[in-house]
């Protein structure tokens, strides 16, 4: 085999592997029953090993970081961020609940299949946006859309923002959060994206979201 042919072959293999990696880490819109039960196990096992309230806290913090986009609350507590409650996120949460209830009742507890199927069939992804502002009601009436290149995707529903809580760290005086729903069929689960929040005072807040790194 010539050097040129070897180079072409290697490039082809790298391209295939890269494409496979991207697809594996994109937001999963469709899950098989096997995938769903693996997600339950992924959530269940760390909680089974958690033997103290501090261990449980660490498990829950790690779970929220896995699908969080935008600012890292550990290093930037008042930076805007969003937790993407994907299908895998919800199933892993079910798994943690299974482990917690099993310990509490001292018997094995498992989620009914109809609950699991309901998550698998969910048409929308819920996100929870967390941000800071200058007064208690700064997030009231906030609007949000998802931008992917030139495409603009509107939220199909936006929850009422929480009344701001006093911010004990540096930055704006209050922190708040709200939820929004986006239809899976309307966005690309692999694309680099930005959630754009528009507040009633005219301020725009952008939360970058690399979907290819979220399950």
Q: Positions of the model-derived regions?
A:
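Bacterial N-terminal signal peptides
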Residues: 10-20
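Bacterial N-terminal signal peptides that target proteins for export
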Residues: 2-11
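Conserved, well-structured beta-alpha core segment at the onset of a catalytic domain
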Residues: 2-3, 19-26
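Conserved functional micro-motifs across diverse proteins
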Residues: 25-193, 197-215
């Amino acid at each position: 085999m010539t050097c040129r042919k070897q180079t072409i072959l290697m490039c082809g293999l790298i391209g295939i592997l890269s494409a496979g990696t991207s697809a594996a880490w994109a937001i999963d819109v469709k899950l098989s029953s096997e995938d769903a039960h693996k997600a339950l196990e992924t959530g269940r096992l760390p909680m089974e090993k958690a033997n103290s309230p501090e261990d449980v806290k660490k498990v829950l913090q790690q779970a929220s970081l896995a699908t969080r986009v935008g600012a890292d609350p550990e290093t930037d507590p008042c930076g805007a961020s969003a937790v993407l409650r994907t299908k895998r996120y919800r199933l892993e949460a079910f798994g943690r609940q299974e482990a917690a209830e099993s310990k509490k009742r001292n018997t094995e507890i498992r989620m009914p299949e109809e609950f699991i199927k309901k998550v698998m069939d969910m048409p929308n992804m819920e996100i929870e946006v967390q941000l800071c502002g200058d007064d208690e009601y700064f997030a009231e009436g906030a609007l949000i859309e998802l931008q992917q290149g030139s495409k603009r995707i509107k939220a199909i529903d936006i929850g009422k923002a929480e009344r701001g809580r006093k911010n004990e760290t540096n930055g704006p005086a209050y922190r708040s959060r709200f939820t929004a729903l986006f239809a899976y069929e309307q966005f690309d689960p692999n694309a680099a994206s930005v959630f754009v929040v528009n507040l009633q005072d005219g301020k725009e807040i952008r939360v970058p979201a690399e979907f290819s790194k979220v399950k």
